[in-house]
A protein has these predicted regions:
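Hydrophobic, small-residue-rich transmembrane alpha-helices and their short perimembrane loops
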Residues: 1-87
Length: 87
């Protein structure tokens, strides 16, 4: 059944699957950043005087959370364009 699959085709197929899974890593940071922004907006609504502190803390937290998504994108791009293990 799998006798006609070449090594190159198998590696490229696995790379595509891995890239798809790596892109899924972007879902978590997106949801987390949306929740954080919503809570920050609610906090500023309750206490407008704390706008600067809330905004700076939110942006720092979102920058840290975004690194996971960026690493997933980097892994996906490497898997799709570098063609690992191929001569």
């Amino acid at each position: 059944m799998m006798s006609n699959i070449t090594d190159e085709g198998f590696i490229l197929g696995c790379s595509a699957i891995g890239a798809g899974l790596a892109v899924i890593a972007g879902i978590g940071p997106g949801v987390g950043q949306g929740i954080a922004a919503g809570h920050a907006a609610a906090a500023v609504g309750r206490n407008p005087g704390a706008k600067g502190d809330v905004t700076s803390t939110m942006l720092l937290g979102q920058a840290v959370a975004e690194t996971t998504g960026l690493y997933g994108l980097l892994v996906a791009m490497l898997l799709m364009f570098v063609k690992p293990l191929l001569p």
